[in-house]
Amino acid sequence: MTNTRKTHPLXKIINHSFIDLPAPSNISAWWNFGSLLGLCLIIQILTGLFLAMHYTSDTMTAFSSVTHICRDVNYGWLIRYMHANGASMFFICLFLHVGRGMYYGSYIYFETWNIGVILLFAVMATAFMGYVLPWGQMSFWGATVITNLLSAIPYIGTTLVEWIWGGFSVDKATLTRFFAFHFILPFIIAALAMVHLLFLHETGSNNPSGLISDSDKIPFHPYYTIKDTLGVLLLILTLMALVLFSPDLLGDPDNYTPANPLSTPPHIKPEWYFLFAYAILRSIPNKLGGVLALVFSILILMLFPLLHLSKQRSMMFRPLSQCVFWILVADLFTLTWIGGQPVEHPFIIIGQLASILYFAIILLILPTVSMIENKLLKW
């Protein structure tokens, strides 16, 4: 008799995705982050759902409702900090997942890659709107500064900003709509993640060598289910250590002050995971130029399949490209550091140089080095 998991319409889909899926035999721990991102999304949706049961999206009561969650709701503090730090874990996994794709040439599957970039944008938008909800000082001023960037769009900019605000400043209407969008977007992200997997399973996974592995496949279960379980345990351990020992480590103290439109904080800065993009935005003295650089700093990922000039897919056997890749990683760390610093000498010039280097590496240096490697290998 045929196994139910291979015949039942629903069980069949799960079977082809997570059980009998043919997977390369040599994929490393860098391939764990897909499942970890799925776990992060589930954690965020569940904790977010319970927070939404007690949260009120009104300017008068939003801050108090978050305080109420932390003080009066059973384990409310735990749910709140799991949600806040869960976002940080989400972005750590995201950056490592994208970095893995860049290093091993996973972007050659361009449909999967482009949906991934759209997912990155969606997660960034969700995180930004979520940061506004507690209605602290940094929530309010972050929302004001970032939404105001749209006013740089010629002709329609100002109208667009007022349309997003639902008035002439960030106020009750803005908070309510941000809450609505923050609630719906994770479900859209979940749907997009399924499409991401659908396209991935059309081609099968890439592997560290970048070679076709059709002749050497193993079933996903039990080999990679057990491997993913280790990743899951490590992620939960890290998250809970952060939540239980140092929940405010990655937050901003300014957000414990209720929003006050009459008092601007000395340094307006976003959460740590946006600092690299914020540094690129600030490094250009022109408003529209800064906004374009900000958008393009993420959108540039979509160009990776077009900029791949190497005859080899992966960087595993390309030491020159590896060197450039790690310089890019160091550059992103530098940008993250600069994004959190005040706008003064020497941080301004460091930020500008780091921004130029970021775009130069991706658009110019990596493709050039790839061609040099082709020549060295007489390809």
From Swiss-Prot:
Gene Ontology CC entries for this record: mitochondrial inner membrane; respiratory chain complex III
Record-annotated membrane-spanning stretches: 33-53, 77-98, 113-133, 178-198, 226-246, 288-308, 320-340, 347-367
Domain of life: Eukaryota
Binding residue positions for a ubiquinone: 201
GO MF term list: metal ion binding; ubiquinol-cytochrome-c reductase activity
Residues that, per the record, bind heme b b566: 97, 196
Protein topology in the membrane: Multi-pass membrane protein
Organism: Spermophilus alashanicus (Alashan ground squirrel)
PROSITE patterns named among the record's database cross-references: CYTB_CTER (PS51003), CYTB_NTER (PS51002)
Protein family (similarity comment): Belongs to the cytochrome b family.
Cofactor(s), names only, from the UniProt record: heme b
Additional information: Heme 1 (or BL or b562) is low-potential and absorbs at about 562 nm, and heme 2 (or BH or b566) is high-potential and absorbs at about 566 nm.
Protein name (record): Cytochrome b
